[in-house]
């Protein structure tokens, strides 16, 4: 585990700017943050090496590509099957997060489905994998 790194105002400003637009050029970041371009280059490189910045990604609007419903499912998983079940569920392209949790459920799954038929398929074919002993599914309203 990497020790925690103290971030100063410049680091935080760079991170905020990248969160707003990960494609921003270093020249643009330099103007926005108010420091030299070399400072931006060095700070970004250091934060990448320290694991603070772990990558850059595209964020899409799920509804614009047909994923109209977000669901949350709680799963009870048989002892000794947790990792295997979670890996199989995470491999489904509709699933975007799988969490270990405390409480009544062993795992919480977040997924996006196209419609009710797709939700029915996910529920019947993924949330009933060998090792899942019980599940509940909720449609996210907002």
Language model features with spans:
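A compositional/biophysical signature of low hydrophobicity enriched in polar/charged and small residues
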Residues: 1-142
């Amino acid at each position: 585990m990497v020790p925690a790194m103290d971030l100063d105002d410049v680091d935080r400003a760079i991170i905020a700017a990248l969160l707003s637009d990960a494609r921003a050029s270093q020249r643009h970041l330099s103007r926005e943050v108010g420091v030299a371009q070399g400072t931006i280059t060095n700070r970004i490189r250091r934060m990448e090496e320290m694991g603070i910045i772990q990558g850059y990604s595209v964020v899409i609007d799920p509804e614009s590509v047909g994923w109209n419903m977000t669901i949350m499912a709680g799963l009870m998983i048989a002892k000794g099957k947790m990792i295997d079940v979670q890996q199989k569920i995470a491999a489904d392209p509709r699933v975007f997060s799988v969490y270990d949790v405390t409480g009544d459920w062993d795992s919480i799954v977040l997924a996006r489905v196209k419609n009710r038929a797709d939700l029915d398929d996910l529920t019947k074919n993924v949330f009933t994998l060998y090792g899942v002993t019980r599940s509940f599914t909720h449609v996210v309203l907002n």
